[in-house]
Amino acid sequence: MTAFYVGPPWQPGVYSDFAITAAYVSPQQHAAQVKKAATRYLGVMKKAATAAGVPCSCAYTSGEYPYLEIVKAAHRNRCDLILMASHGRRGISRLLLGSETSKVLAHSTVPVLVCR
């Protein structure tokens, strides 16, 4: 099993004549924040897999399009199956926010199992 985490990409702060509209985070600080979040999330996954007797490797990246990173990682690791959760968004929130799970389903040639 490979547990995988995709964090948000680094983006520079936005400046205007009046104020800084977003707190500046350097690329190095951003990478450290993504690593911290990934370590926390993947640690939970690895602990559960280990408790069930399932070997588990962990990997993470950041990217603008998480679904593409997931599909690429599945191919890179020669995965037989992608397991994803569904948050069950409905209506306007799904239209506005989209669904990474739906996008993986649409773009992956590797089978996808969706759990609620």
Positions of the model-derived regions?
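Glycine-rich, Arg-bearing micro-motifs that act as flexible, cationic patches
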Residues: 81-107
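A short acidic, glycine-rich active-site loop
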Residues: 23-40
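Short, hinge-like loop/turn segments at secondary-structure boundaries
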Residues: 18-22, 75-77, 100-101
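Small/aliphatic-rich secondary-structure junction motif
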Residues: 1-24, 48-57
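Structural beta-alpha unit
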Residues: 47-82
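Conserved beta-strand termini and adjacent loop/short-helix elements that scaffold enzyme active sites
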Residues: 4-6, 59-63, 115
